[in-house]
């Protein structure tokens, strides 16, 4: 029903009528990527493409979260069911109703979890730190409401490491690198 509803949400009304891009509040990534997606600096209503794109991005996010948390384990059907709330929770379903903003909100979530894909326990993780800085900046420049996702995933991974009885020093190094990368990315 969301794809077929063809109803403009609050922010969509002005964009449909005037075609402006101004996502505001420092959302430069959203402004620039919207030029690529819409093929012009003047936005036109290309829904339901934007909603479908947001759904696809959230599906990718769900798979990446499973890969991050399960590491090398095989993904089973109950893991997929457990990951469904990532893209289908009631709080994010509202975001799909924004015809113009939905893909950039989903991208912000992708930017928030992407650094963990590059975290490897066996190396020095310079790539993890650099990608954390870049992805945190991109998250903040696309949709700042996703700012709490990175710290929460950091906590989940640290608790998982603790539960797996890993060395406390490794856990602290992971947390410190995550905090440093996150803070630098926000600055």
Predicted regions and their residues:
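Juxtamembrane "helix-exit" motif on the non-cytosolic side of transmembrane helices
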Residues: 2-10, 37-40, 88-98, 162
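Membrane-interface micro-motifs in multi-pass membrane enzymes
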Residues: 23, 27, 54, 77-120, ...
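Membrane-interface transmembrane helices that cradle and orient dolichyl/undecaprenyl
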Residues: 112-129, 161-166
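Membrane-interface alpha helices of multi-pass inner-membrane proteins
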Residues: 128-144, 149, 155
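Perimembrane helix-loop-helix junctions
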Residues: 149-183
């Amino acid at each position: 029903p969301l794809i077929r509803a063809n109803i403009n949400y609050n922010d969509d009304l002005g964009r449909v009528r005037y075609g402006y891009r101004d996502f505001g509040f420092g959302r430069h990534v959203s402004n620039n990527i919207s030029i690529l997606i819409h093929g012009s600096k003047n936005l036109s209503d290309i829904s339901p493409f934007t909603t479908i794109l947001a759904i696809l991005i959230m599906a990718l996010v769900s798979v990446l979260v499973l890969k991050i948390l399960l590491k090398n384990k095989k993904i089973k059907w109950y893991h997929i069911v457990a990951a469904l709330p990532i893209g289908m929770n009631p709080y994010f379903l509202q975001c799909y109703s924004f015809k113009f903003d939905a893909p950039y909100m989903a991208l912000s979530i992708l930017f928030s979890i992407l650094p963990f894909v590059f975290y490897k326990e066996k190396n020095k993780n310079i790539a993890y730190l650099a990608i954390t800085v870049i992805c945190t900046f991109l998250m903040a420049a696309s949709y700042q409401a996703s700012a709490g996702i990175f710290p929460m995933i950091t906590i989940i991974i640290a608790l998982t490491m603790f539960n797996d009885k890993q060395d406390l020093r490794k856990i602290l190094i992971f947390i410190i690198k995550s905090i440093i990368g996150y803070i630098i990315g926000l600055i």
